[in-house]
């Protein structure tokens, strides 16, 4: 899988750019604030149907413009796809091979991407939200149906929480509707939990392999699903998860009415990361946390390959300055041989370190992306 070329117009600060890309390595060099990360954001958006930086579409449109356009030409096995997204201040319009699509979520399952940036340290050291988002984004790309489950679950959860608030304030007293929401929450929520457990079962093997390579076998990383429903939930079948979830809601009912929100479910769960048996979020050094984040991203890359039959596009946003030689060379080894990669940097790092048959280097300045004729 690789992007042959991409057209951007008025996306963030990017003016009008048509870029012919290398099918392996592409390096984008420029000072901060020139548009490098905006370019990666556009690619990420086309793969995941969402920005990793904002939920407000208007922020994606260049100042004083009415719309932004991102169009890319994707080569996927023997298939060629033209994917076009127009972002207005109120709506997004998507076309695939010039055929209008009803939902922007139809982007999912076409272009697969893995993004690694300095912000990914939050994946390890910050709260559970970042790790849930990591799992959900990955699952939505390889299983677009999962995105539908997640969207439906969040709608049901919102309705249930609204009802709990009304019961808390005394505006309502009948709990009959709560039982209806409970059953829907259980049906969808249990499937989300099961999907997350399945992906963690695969990721933990891949992450362990990557981590041992990076650390020369000195450290072992372990991933596990930490559920708000029950210990050892990963050992349960789908119907057992439903029973546990249902019972949890019944047992929590009085407290939930008192607090006005739902206390258990996949929205409260976490991906636990340990290194040599130690909770790395609480006790790991920043170097260990960064290594763990890199291991997770490399595992994500290999997981998508195993699920989709080809590697996703790898986006590296100013990460080379954050990595020591060993971690940098591990990334270089991967991208040089198998993966179309986009790297952003503020200066020319040692490109001679990269053993790849082809490379394109681009200059990014004031929203304009141009190719360097020579290094």
Curated annotation (Swiss-Prot):
GO terms for molecular function: ATP binding; single-stranded DNA binding. Transmembrane segments: none annotated. Keywords: ATP-binding, Cytoplasm, DNA damage, DNA repair, DNA replication, DNA-binding, Nucleotide-binding, SOS response. SUPFAM superfamilies: P-loop containing nucleoside triphosphate hydrolases. ATP binds at residues 30-37. InterPro entries: DNA-binding_RecF, DNA-binding_RecF_CS, P-loop_NTPase, RecF/RecN/SMC_N, RecF_2. GO terms for cellular component: cytoplasm. It is found in: Cytoplasm. GO terms for biological process: DNA replication; DNA synthesis involved in DNA repair; double-strand break repair; SOS response. HAMAP family: RecF (MF_00365). Belongs to the RecF family. The RecF protein is involved in DNA metabolism; it is required for DNA replication and normal SOS inducibility. RecF binds preferentially to single-stranded, linear DNA. It also seems to bind ATP. This is DNA replication and repair protein RecF. The gene is recF.
């Amino acid at each position: 899988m690789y992007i042959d070329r991409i057209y951007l117009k008025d996306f963030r600060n990017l003016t009008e750019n048509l870029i012919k890309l290398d099918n392996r390595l592409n390096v984008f060099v420029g000072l901060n604030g020139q548009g490098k990360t905006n370019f990666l954001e556009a690619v990420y958006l086309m793969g995941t149907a969402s920005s990793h930086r904002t939920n407000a579409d208007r922020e994606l449109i260049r100042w004083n413009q009415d719309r932004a356009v991102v169009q890319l030409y994707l080569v996927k096995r023997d298939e060629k796809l033209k994917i076009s997204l127009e972002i207005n201040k109120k709506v997004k319009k998507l076309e695939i091979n010039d055929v209008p699509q009803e939902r922007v979520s139809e982007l999912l399952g076409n272009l697969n991407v893995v993004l690694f940036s300095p912000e990914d340290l939050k994946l390890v050291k910050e709260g559970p939200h970042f790790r849930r988002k990591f799992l959900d984004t990955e699952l939505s790309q390889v299983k677009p149906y999962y995105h539908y489950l997640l969207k439906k679950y969040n709608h049901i959860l919102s309705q249930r929480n609204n009802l709990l608030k009304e019961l808390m304030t005394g505006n309502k007293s009948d709990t009959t509707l709560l039982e209806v929401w409970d059953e829907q929450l259980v049906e969808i929520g249990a499937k989300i939990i099961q999907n997350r457990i399945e992906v963690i079962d695969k990721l933990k093997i891949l992450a362990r392999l990557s981590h041992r390579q990076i650390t020369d076998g000195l450290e072992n990383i372990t991933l596990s699903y930490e559920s708000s429903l029950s210990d050892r939930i990963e050992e349960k079948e789908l119907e057992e998860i439903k029973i546990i979830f249902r019972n949890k809601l019944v047992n929590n009912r009085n407290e939930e009415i008192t607090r006005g929100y739902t206390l258990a479910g996949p929205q409260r769960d976490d991906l636990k990361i340990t290194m040599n048996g130690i909770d790395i979020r609480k006790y790991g050094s920043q170097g260990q946390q960064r290594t763990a984040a890199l291991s997770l991203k490399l595992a994500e890359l290999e997981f998508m390959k195993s699920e989709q039959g080809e590697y996703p596009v790898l986006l590296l946003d100013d990460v080379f300055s954050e990595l020591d030689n060993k971690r940098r060379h591990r990334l270089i080894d991967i991208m040089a041989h198998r993966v179309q990669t986009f790297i952003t940097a503020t200066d020319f790092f040692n490109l001679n370190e990269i053993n790849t048959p082809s490379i394109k280097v681009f200059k990014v300045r004031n929203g304009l992306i141009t190719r360097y004729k020579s290094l």
